[in-house]
Amino acid sequence: MGSDKAAVWVTNWDTERNGSSLTPRDGTSYLLANAFMLAYDYGQPHIFSGYYYAGVDDGAPGATRTSVPDMTCPTDGIETAGTWHCAQRWTAIRGMIGFRNAVAGTFTA
């Protein structure tokens, strides 16, 4: 598939809960997988952000049947009960987004 038609990601809202991909709970491995995805010039990368959950059917922290409250994103990548993980704000991910933008259009072999 051509790079212009590809969407790439490490995890998404389904795969993070079914055990088939890395998640923020995997720590450095998850961070490095996202860094590689951003470093490699293929496809449109998608950085997944979500929230800590204990059970696979858990909703967002503080959510009701009709609303999700405003949330606070930690920037340190530490995921704890009742918190959100916002990978796009992590220092390493922000740096790799900058790197990808800076080298856009260069050839990778």
Regions found by a protein language model. Give the residues of each.
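Active-site-proximal substrate-binding groove within the catalytic cores of carbohydrate-active enzymes
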Residues: M1-A109
